[in-house]
Amino acid sequence: MNGEQQLDADLGSGVEVEEFSWEDYLEETGATTAPYASFKHVDICLQSGFAPGMKLEVALRKDPETYWVATVITACEQLLLLRYEGYGEDRKADFWCDIRRAGLYPIGWCQQNKKTLEAPEGIRDKVSDWSAFLQRTLTGACGPPVALLEGLRNGRNPLDLIAPGSRLECQDFRDSVSTWIVTVVENIGGRLKLQYEGLERHDGFEHWLYYLDPFLHHIGWAAQQGYELQPPLAIRHLKNEADWQEILARVKEEEPLPSYLFKDKQVIRTHEFSINMKLEAVDPWSPFGISPATIAKVFDDKYFLVEIDDLRPEDHARRSFVCHANSPGIFPVQWSLKNGLHINPPPGFRSQDFDWADYLKQCGAEAAPQKCFPQSVSEHQFKENMKLEAVNPLFPEEVSIATVTAVRGSYLWLQLEGSKKPVPEFIVSVESMNIFPLGWCETNGHPLSTPRRARGHKLRKIAVVQPEKQILSSRTVHEGLKNQLNSPHSVMINGKYCCPKIYFNHRCFSGPYLNKGRIAELPQCVGPGNCVLVLREVLTLLINAAYKPSRVLRELQLDKDSVWHGCGEVLKAKYKGKSYRATVEIVRTADRVTEFCRQTCIKLECCPNLFGPRMVLDTCSENCSVLTKTKYTHYYGKKKNKRIGRPPGGHSNLSCALKKTSKRRKRRKNIFVHKKKRSSASVDNTPVGSPQGSGGEDEDDADDGDDDSLTEGSTSEQQDELHEESEVSEKKSCSPSPTQSEMSTPLPPDTQTDKREAQTSSLSDGENKPPSPKEIRIEVDERLHLDSNPLKWSVADVVRFIRSTDCAPLARIFLDQEIDGQALLLLTLPTVQECMDLKLGPAIKLCHHIERIKFAFYEQFAN
């Protein structure tokens, strides 16, 4: 795979698209959600199928091998409150059980399976003849269906029994009451995709119905009602009669779905409509207005045919649909006028103003009386500007966000947002089974069409970049983000949530955690766009630009004392082949972006202008050019007053021959001394010279407990970052003991004091000595004479010295990582290897020169 292909693959695998967030969308639009209780059909589908008073056989809680009869007292979704028979009205022994886990069986199961049926110990002596007692108790009792209990034992809800491939009966709701078999293609939360039996999927006769729809029934319903099973007229010509009968015979041999699944369906009452009665109606196939309509046919006392009036010649197709007495969308004449609504005159109507009195006289018809129509739902909780999820009437496979634009009686006017094609405002009943509460699609795994502006709000690109691919990948991911934010298909986000461009000012001081070289390779800016989206990308790039990404992720981790009140976003980091995750708080509004960036910079101990909405061209307002890796806290301080330890034997880089290397490294206890106040005349006690760490890296020792809050990826070994970072800190901090000549060299007062403190508060150097591949000896015959105090060397002075040695190729690293004299004096072999990515040979060679500087410092300037 070439570089470009690898890059494309990395980009493709590193991008995640998150789902639409209702919470963010409601905040942006200032809307409210329709109450969950308003969607009765959704609430019904969550019911378990159990009802108070049902009896069943249940295992005793103290003896699972023994069973007794219990009565359902209360059913609450998956929980049942049960009472054993014999306790009467005594509630003390009532108990709750999970219907999926408890052993629940129908009455008679114990006898069939030769199980012990015995009363609980608490009431065992209460009745002398339990057999007679049960016979009296169970006479006329009802229990849950056997299929329901079997399904629950297999981990299936009642609704799950309507699985793909199941057969049902469906009435033809266009022109007659003929009923035919349909096959369930999909079941999404009770919303069924159906196909007429005998047809192929590509025939175009698939349709969607909710499982409680009045026109959908269990197998056998037509025979019970006296209706004939025959295919609808629209498909009848596709096969001959013999083929249809063969299909019917095959279906009848199959075991049907249990009828109790449909027990909550609406009961159809008898109607009082007559042929030629006039009314107002909403065409269910085009529910965008109210039109005059006529009762064209009465099939029986339950069903009739409504036809939308059309005064044009007969060769035009008539729009008709089957109704029953409770059908929504039919109104008495003048209903529109009384509710201040417009009624669409029938096509071919010549007058501009439609008047019912004139129209009835013209047609010679009578209006259907008020008593024929269903009772209006007087109490519901829908209000204008509420949001919900609704089926697209033109494309029933699509569910979109909808806004209630008007409420009239028990009817809603909805406007879809985010549908694939524009759809006019349409009318639904408050009891429609094509509307759903907030989050229904997400809960049931149904795709939700969302507005483009909202979709842009939550689209996120997450770059989890390998360290060695950081430079190239970060640029590529940024280009993808830029293209997304500037896409012509995205609509401008609400200004309150629109983040300005965030610039990376790589000339500013990068601090102890961030690699200045990697910062310089980041894109110039990210954004503009949604605040959460842009800031998430910025923080991801910064984490990947760190010496130790997991350390920066821990610094950024959500603090319980946070004052931002933003949103928590899960960010990722990779370090040494392990993946880490942590929740980081990000502000959501544009007015807080500047301060958020500044405080994040301070938290990372870098220049407050390193990244933010302001581009630094030449001179930083913070004058951060005077800062080095060792001088940050003198100017900005630390957010937390952490205890920082000094590495034992900090004056020497290499192990000496005076002590043997310990065979096995022991875990060093984290005992620390307080940080001394910085003085320009003394060597800083904190290991800030480490390019990776400054004070922060040895804070790993003090903060190891914090790493438990980082979630390690599944690919890592079975140990947390606490152990990993302890080892790293140990390796860096446990420098070998000083040489004999060092020990005889007088030290500055502060240094001597600190050395005594470190020696009394830490374990012996013999225990802390890191393992080395072989004993390393350093001869210090080559005396070095220094013209200036290395403690006061600038970065340029350090680079100049390195270039004068045989380690000149490494000078660039010292320049990039801004290592000044103080930092140079604190470098150790483990630190050099880890932070400069040097192999052992070059690292030893470099440390040899650093050792010479240290000896010269002690001899010339220590006093």
Curated annotation (Swiss-Prot):
Chief site of localization: nucleus
GO BP, sorted A to Z: cell differentiation; chromatin organization; negative regulation of DNA-templated transcription; negative regulation of muscle organ development; spermatogenesis
Domain of life per record: Eukaryota
MBT repeats: 20-120, 128-232, 242-346, 354-451
Keywords: Chromatin regulator, Differentiation, Nucleus, Phosphoprotein, Repeat, Repressor, Spermatogenesis, Transcription, Transcription regulation
Positions with biased composition (Acidic residues): 696-710
Molecular functions (GO terms): chromatin binding; histone binding; transcription corepressor activity
Bias (Basic residues) ranges: 660-679
Any Pfam family hit: SAM_1
One GO cellular component term noted in the UniProt record for this chain: nucleus
Annotated positions of the Phosphoserine modification: S764, S772
InterPro entries tied to this protein: Mbt, MBT_SFMBT1_rpt2, MBT_SFMBT1_rpt3, PcG_chromatin_remod_factors, SAM, SAM/pointed_sf, Scm-like-4MBT1/2_SAM, SLED
Domain (SAM): residue spans on this chain: 793-861
Database matches in PANTHER family: POLYCOMB GROUP PROTEIN (PTHR12247), SCM-LIKE WITH FOUR MBT DOMAINS PROTEIN 1 (PTHR12247:SF77)
Subunit structure and binding partners: Interacts with MYOD1. Component of the SLC (SFMBT1-LSD1-CoREST) corepressor complex, which also contains KDM1A/LSD1 and RCOR1/CoREST. Interacts with KDM1A/LSD1 and RCOR1/CoREST. Interacts with MYOD1. Interacts with L3MBTL3.
Domain-related comment: The MBT repeats mediate binding to histones tails; however, in contrast to other MBT repeats, does not bind specific histone lysine modifications. The MBT repeats lack the conserved Asp and aromatic cage at conserved positions.
Protein name as catalogued: Scm-like with four MBT domains protein 1
Organism listed in the record: Rattus norvegicus
